[in-house]
Amino acid sequence: MNKQDFYFDLPSELIAQYPLANRSDSRLLIYNRQTEEYGHYQFREIADFLQPGDLLVMNDSKVIPARLYGHKATGGKVELLVERITGDFTFLAHIKASKSLKSNDFIYLDAGKRLEVLERQDDLFLCKASENILDLLNDLGHIPLPPYIAREDESLDKERYQTVYAKCAGSVAAPTAGLHFDDAVLSSIRARGVNIAYVTLHVGAGTFRPVRCERIQDHKMHSEWFTVSPDLCAAVKAAKSMGNRVIAVGTTALRSLESAAMGGELIPCSRDTDIFIYPGYQFKVCDGLITNFHLPESTLVMLVSAFIGHQECMALYQEAIDKRYRFFSYGDASLLL
């Protein structure tokens, strides 16, 4: 298939620039693959469409304030986006500067703190901080909002560009399907008899990388680190053995589960994945998916197309546009069953 097969015209005013006042105020578009029927609801109603014994799998990765601003010894401005923390003091980052940096260059930050460039690794730079990098980011870092949110980060983003169950620090973009859940929704889901389990996948900046090749099969996915625990594997197997559904909360949870089952059986693992799911893929674990509405021609639209069918996906997105759903990270959600 070609990239343009996944194009749709999205009015710019449907790209959400801010979150709604309350997480669960988001709208929810439900699509049933068997009946091919749509339903329009509020996200707070989602428990009504889940069944006792269903297993929701959520990504508990926590967004780090990964954007830093500094300057070189010459005074030139430098902007960093931390891609991956590799040690207590070391990390890989994308760096924007008027002139490319080289090994042993220093980047000076506020409060007398500094970073040293150790080496270049392809498009990234390996750097060393003058103190624990997570502490430094928490002191000086900014929330790395996606490129389609056309504003600077604000104080509200520290809370709202984060799921309420985030635990494991490491993502530079939020697993956005989880942003709609608040404590009341989680309580209603548990009261319904639905089980919840967690995977960890640290979302990298590569999630925003566009598909540049015409044949989608030629696209090379970015790599992200994930963990599927023995407890999660046991929960999935228990649900499957009872004939219950496994529903991924977000494409990151789905990609983690499918990566861990690439050999045909779900196994515990902790490693990188560059799995690319597009039409023709045979799903091994997931029976349902909760996800936001994604960019035209993106790998995430291709994943949704693989899950519900290409024509069905394009029709679903047209339905969302016609009904004025909000798109992307701070937008509305869909439940695909």
From Swiss-Prot:
Disulfide linkage: none
Subunit composition and interactions: Monomer.
Keywords: Cytoplasm, Queuosine biosynthesis, S-adenosyl-L-methionine, Transferase
Domain of life: Bacteria
Organism lineage string: Bacteria, Pseudomonadati, Pseudomonadota, Gammaproteobacteria, Legionellales
GO molecular function, one term: S-adenosylmethionine:tRNA ribosyltransferase-isomerase activity
Enzyme Commission number: 2.4.99.17
Broad EC category: transferase
Pathway, per record: tRNA modification; tRNA-queuosine biosynthesis
Subcellular location(s) of the protein: Cytoplasm
Gene Ontology CC terms: cytoplasm
Coarse class of the protein's main subcellular location: cytoplasm
Gene from which the chain derives: queA
Protein name as it appears in the record: S-adenosylmethionine:tRNA ribosyltransferase-isomerase
Annotated catalysed reactions: 7-aminomethyl-7-carbaguanosine(34) in tRNA + S-adenosyl-L-methionine = epoxyqueuosine(34) in tRNA + adenine + L-methionine + 2 H(+)
